[in-house]
Amino acid sequence: MKFTLVATVLLTFSLSAFAVEYPVLTIASPDQVGFDSQKLHRLDGWIQNQIDAGYPSINLLVIKDNHIVLQKAWGYAKKYDGSTLLAHPIRATTNTMYDLASNTKMYATNFALQKLVYEGKIDVNDLVSKYIPGFKDMPGDKIKGKDKLRIIDILHHVAGFPADPQYPNKNVAGKLFSQSKSTTLEMIKKTPLEYQPGSKHIYSDVDYMILGFIIESITAMPLDRYVETTIYKPLGLKHTVFNPLMKGFTPPQIAATELHGNTRDGVIHFPNIRTNTLWGQVHDEKAWYSMGGVSGHAGLFSDTHDMAVLMQVMLNGGGYGNLKLFDDKTVAQFTRHSPEDATFGLGWRVNGNASMTPTFGVLASPQTYGHTGWTGTLTSIDPVNHMAIVILGNRPHSPVANPKVNPNVFVSGLLPAATYGWIVDQIYGSLK
């Protein structure tokens, strides 16, 4: 009996000795962690000027040394209904949820992959065909190589796929047209390569659509259920979901995006296209029409606090509090720049050369990594300065500047606030 008791005590002590307790975020004043508060405050006026000039809204949060030192919202979550300015626009708050667009790639798909790699359930050198049956070259394909594509090739964006096949738009997609998830997977298999794999980088949504399907194959769960139940819920995140309107959230909690659906103010048309102001539905066309709102490349919504926790997980080397999702070796593996391009890690964008200045500014360390999203979102994680910045915005919630010339340029996209690096530099420049 004594031996059993002693053994139990020793085992408990042994396990507790190896338990990892990761830092959790607390709130501190900027001065407490090395910022000049007066300099940092200047950013407030500059962002407000951008809002006054027509930028819809900006939510900003800054982390330094495990502390939230700045969290603020400017502008409006919804100011238009169609082309009509609302008499009483809805103000953005620090709790407003935003369509993350391509930041979904990192904080849903990459987080899931990093967890699965750490758990030994997948290897980045595995062939894609191991998880997606029928993923192979098609008769008549001019460029061959699908059979040999590895997950690491997909993550590095060197797999040969086009940037945006526009599956839901039959006028563009042609035989690859799809507005259902099951058909979309078959169309991805049939999508011809545009260049020889490994010969160059082409940032492609298709790559991350494939990765989403791979995660579902391994886990036997829909992507949204997997990340929401095994990552977000254990972290205590309450505002990070796919398809928020189907999960208890209401439009006033969410920032609106494009004014006239996906029509770019009336110049784009295809079957089932949305025409009302988008509010609580993912903006991305492939994610909405072709994937039902849940895709590896887009579809995730979140707020700045939840994003701060996810960025802190990365700064911590894979955990938060008493929760371990992956380890520091996995973080290093995924954020190390590729041999071919210093600006690409495994999915993550890395501050590897001057081409990333518009994203990360000129003052962040070369080891900084993160991602951007088409709707106006940025995440920047700097392990050298133990610092992270998240900017969430709803840039498409403004008129298209000139629909006939370029339907993808919005009036707000012409403002300086659309260049994240300037904001990032003002934050770094406020360090003492």
Swiss-Prot record:
Cellular component terms (Gene Ontology) = plasma membrane
Which keywords does UniProt give here? Carboxypeptidase, Cell inner membrane, Cell membrane, Hydrolase, Membrane, Protease, Transmembrane, Transmembrane helix
Q: What is its main location?
A: membrane
What molecular functions are annotated in GO for this chain?
serine-type D-Ala-D-Ala carboxypeptidase activity
Give the first-level EC class, as a single word: hydrolase
* EC number of the protein: 3.4.16.4
- Organism name: Salmonella enteritidis PT4 (strain P125109)
Record Gene3D superfamilies:
DD-peptidase/beta-lactamase superfamily
In terms of domain of life, where is this protein from? Bacteria
What this protein is called in its record is Putative D-alanyl-D-alanine carboxypeptidase
GO BP terms, alphabetized: proteolysis
State which residue ranges cross the membrane: 7-25
Family, according to the entry, reads as follows:
Belongs to the peptidase S12 family. YfeW subfamily.
- PANTHER family, per the entry: BETA-LACTAMASE-RELATED, BETA-LACTAMASE-RELATED DOMAIN-CONTAINING PROTEIN
Matching InterPro entries: Beta-lactam-related, Beta-lactam/transpept-like, Diverse_Enzym_Activities, Pept_S12_YfeW/YbbE-like
> Which Pfam family name is an example for this entry?
Beta-lactamase
Reaction(s) this enzyme catalyzes, per UniProt: Preferential cleavage: (Ac)2-L-Lys-D-Ala-|-D-Ala. Also transpeptidation of peptidyl-alanyl moieties that are N-acyl substituents of D-alanine
Tell me the compartments it is located in. Answer: Cell inner membrane
Annotated membrane topology is:
Single-pass membrane protein
SUPFAM superfamilies, alphabetized: beta-lactamase/transpeptidase-like (SSF56601)
